[in-house]
Amino acid sequence: MDTHQSFNENQHPNFNSGNHGGINMNRFQRFSKPTISPIQQQQQPQPQQPSSIIQRQSIIMTQPQPQPQPQMIPIFREPNEWYKLIDMEMNKFNNESRPSPEYIKYLTQLFQQALDSLEHKNTPEFYLFLLNRATFQSKIGENEDAKGTLKYMKVLKMESFEVFVLLSEIESKSFRFSKARSIINRGIQKIPSRSKEFEGFLMVIDIQEDEFSRNGCIISNNNNISFNNGDVNNNSIIMNENDQPMVINLNPQQQQQQQQQPYEISSSSSLMSTPASSRHLSNRSSIVPTPNSSTKLSESIKTIGLRSVQPRRVIHKQTTTNFNTTTTTIPENSYDDDADQPMDHDGNNNNNFRIHSNNNNNSSANSSYNKSENDEDDQDEEDEEEEDEDEDDDEEDEEEYEDNNNNNNNNNNNNNNNNNNNNNNNNNNYFKYNRQQYILNNDSDTSTNPNSPASSNSSVNDIINSISITDDSKLDYENNVKLQQQQQQQQQQQQQQQQQQQQQQQQQYIQQQQQQQPKIHPQRFSLQNNTPTTTTTTTAATNVQNPSSSSSYISPPLSSQSSELQHQRRHSIQAQRANKPPVIPPPSKLHQNNLQQQQQQQQQQQQQQQQQQQQQLLLQQQALLQQQQQQQILLQQQQQQQQQQQQQQQQQKQQEQQLKKTNMQPPPPKQPQPQTQTQQQQKNINNSEIVDKEKSFEVAKSWSEVAMVNGKPYLRIEFIGKGGSGKVYKVLSGDLKIYALKYVCLSDPNEIEAQLNEIEMLKRLRKQVNIIQLIDYEVNMAKNYILLVLEFGEIDLSKLLQRLQTPNGTNVNFIRIYWQQMLQAVHTIHEEKIIHGDLKPANFVSVQGSLKLIDFGIAKAIQSDDTTNIVRESQIGTINYISPEALIDTSQGGPKQCMKLGRASDIWSLGCILYEMAFGYPPFKSFSNIISKYQAIINPHHKIEFPVHPNENLLKVLKLCLIRNPHERPTIPTLLNHDFLKI
């Protein structure tokens, strides 16, 4: 009986283990694991397997006939119980260094049971469950199953930062670095907020790929090691390479040889300098021996599905030559910092290396050395750098020493000294003392060089002992150095005295030569070291006169002396070099010309940069001037329009007053005057223009839709916008004028009432300049629509503010002009005893440069007490600009809300619009939740924040308009006379 079928019959009817939410979960797993209850698990016999066999959880054991599994009683838990249990077990699993195979099997079954019982939905809890399952599968080596779980998370739209990182880590374990990198790049596209962390993982992938290309494996990644299920005493290790295990078995002879002898490695191996390699070497004792003693090391390496690259577990190298055999060996405990250092047969410390050399009976002794570098010891690297610098100084000192000997004509001593130095260099090969002791076992006699006096008095071992300095003799060495410094100072004083004597003798000799020969060729003297080299008699004379000085200063050290004399010579030469003044050669003409050319080029570059900067500044200034001119032109135009509007209003008032005085008597009709020829010509021109317009309009009908309003055609040009149940189009009339056509569908009774109310208000305000003009309208109740032909506005105030908004805020001059026009428009409707009730930036449109008020759907007439009652089933107006009193219900429990509003309610809305013009956002924009925003508006204790603004008068106007008490708010005339509008 199939395990999944038996489990599906007994599980809860709401869940389906094979098909979760229409998705087959089994296709995301490489194989399905049987579900076994804990009781049946104890009853099943556990097969005994040898400890040398290494098993992995991910290997599928193919059998000819699958064994039938006993039917399991499903365990039903609440989802929270499953999540808590999985979380607890994963914490326990992460804390264990070597989880047992039984515990791994238990966790596998636990995850399977939870997966079958939980509902597969995109929830945070189920996301954590699947992420824990993928992490667990990756840690136990089930990389394919982990990838299947992560792919299933992608199907459930659970793409997160952790999913991409875990997928890329699995691919990098399998050395598919390009795929891992593509996964991280996909994660950067999906989750750009975590791009910095993704870039860090890209760097890790590059490092791993570099290690893999150099070493054949990832040394720094220690997560690729898992332990065998067998006996712990065997200490068998499996290293996952290309998602495949590798088993290394050694026979007993090889294991015994490894325990007795240190492991042999190549001195050029890069593993010696890395801390990670030391951990691999320390685990080499855990390689499992096999009972077969006749097999070799190469035969004992059994790879299971390995690719071209194999992990470097043991590096064995032995070089043989015709003359000598050299093997570098490392003790097992040489990489442990706390372990004691092994002792050689003489009782000396060996730090990390021993050198065993077997020399044949040849004519010359060939010494080989090895240099070890430890990255963990920074002091060793500094010592080596200092030694390299000392070697360079030695070479320079030897050259200077040879020059001094040549100047003093001590060629014989100089040749002996060079021979001694060459012999010493050939023998010791610059052995370094770097906190390590080198022991050279010389088993054969060395041949001597008859030309060198050192070969008869000292051997190779004496030279090494004279050069190498151990850790125990460092204090003695420092004391000797101090004594040498004192001796050097004394020698320097003696040398200075000798030089003074030589200079005096030279001056005397030069005076004698000048007396004998008044004309001397300039080439007979050389200025090297201030000593004449014209004849050999002078140097001979000085040598005869000062035999002690020449012997004490020029005599080279014999080869039988120790290295202390070499150190003395080195310090004396360094002291002489320090006392010499630096020789600065005069600059050549070519060098001077080059310097002049460079200076000229630099000056030219600086001049070009200055010119470019000046041009940029000029361009910026010109752009600013153009902007200022445009602003001034706009201001002048708006001021002219305002003056014209004021004049028209004054004329209307005067006409009304005259009508009142004349008791509403109409003026007498004008008598028709005879038409002149010019008037007739104008009429003819107008008639011809009308004919042309009609023709063009008829042509335009062929390519555009036509809307009929009261029998008049209007061509639809483009769609402007929509709001509620209405749509607005840009149309062209028969006389070729642009208008706005508003189409409203009468599906809601409230909408019908609002549109009819707007028509009445616009008809009432038809003669007002600051109000949008109603051109024509049609109400068709049979077809449930209303058509309104309105004056066309180019742009509303909301979009205009977005264009004018800058990082420094909107220009105060623009705010002042638009604020004045808004006040005049609202003052017009207040004079007609109308309250708008829904003032916002979108309800002010710009018509040929001037702002006009639109949307009178909820406007109401004011009653006798300067207020009006607005009854609605829901709130009215836009909440960002609505006044507190418009949100307070005064119906006292009635079926509909009743708000009592006045002119002060529109003042509050104007203040909110001015706040947005000044700071870029309305006063209650910070509250994202509509309920919290509602409570903040009606709360009298909530203080509105007023940011800092350079114009103090603007802040004063804002604070006056946003007073919570409507009786304390200013009126429109007060705001028009405020200092803010005075330029």
From Swiss-Prot:
Keywords: ATP-binding, Coiled coil, Kinase, Nucleotide-binding, Serine/threonine-protein kinase, Transferase. GO terms for molecular function: ATP binding; protein serine kinase activity; protein serine/threonine kinase activity; protein serine/threonine/tyrosine kinase activity. Residues 1-26, 252-430, 441-460, 513-601, 654-691 are annotated as: Disordered. Belongs to the protein kinase superfamily. Ser/Thr protein kinase family. It holds the Pfam family Pkinase. Residues 714-981 form the Protein kinase domain. CDD domains: PKc_Mps1. Residues 253-278, 319-329, 348-371, 404-429, 529-563, 673-683 have a biased composition (Low complexity). The lineage of its organism: Eukaryota, Amoebozoa, Evosea, Eumycetozoa, Dictyostelia. Residues 374-403 have a biased composition (Acidic residues). It is an enzyme of class 2 (transferase). Residues 1-18, 279-301 have a biased composition (Polar residues). InterPro entries: Kinase-like_dom_sf (IPR011009), Mps1_cat (IPR027084), Prot_kinase_dom (IPR000719), Protein_kinase_ATP_BS (IPR017441). This is Probable serine/threonine-protein kinase mps1. The keyword Cell membrane does not apply. Residues 380-430, 474-517, 588-665 form a coiled coil. It comes from Dictyostelium discoideum.
